[in-house]
Amino acid sequence: MLLNERIESAFRDVSALGSHVFVFILIVFAYLIGLKLLSLQLLVAVVLSYFIIMIIRTFYFRNRPVKEKFNSFFSKIDSSSFPSAHSSRGIIILILLSKYFNNLYLTLFLSFCTLVLIYSRLRLKKHFFSDILAGAILGVVISLFVLRVVQ
């Protein structure tokens, strides 16, 4: 395998940290080890993010940098680039876990992971910078809202 292929593969792996599956596993894991408040905050934030992004993508479709084909309403929404759901979920995880654990080293580690995740979406040509920025802003707003409401 060529070096460039390995790098691309690594970025695809990192990008999975913002996927629905990873976040669902994180929520279930937090619940199972007794972190029920964190689990609930993550669940509310991710569901809220999902619905807001779905509404935005329903009314404002933007092709990804590498255009994807779609043949149904849901695949069209998934093919839309704006805003980045991965960025939104990455920021949500960063803020909620950092606030819950209040640990500088964990916050620095999560910040690094989130930056790499965000960069991976650009590198893999899944989003434009403005998609990433909008997703990140949405993640911040939702996280702050959830921290205020879900206590």
Task: Label the model's feature ranges.
Residues 1-25, 37, 53-79:
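N-terminal transmembrane-helix/juxtamembrane module of multi-pass inner/ER membrane proteins
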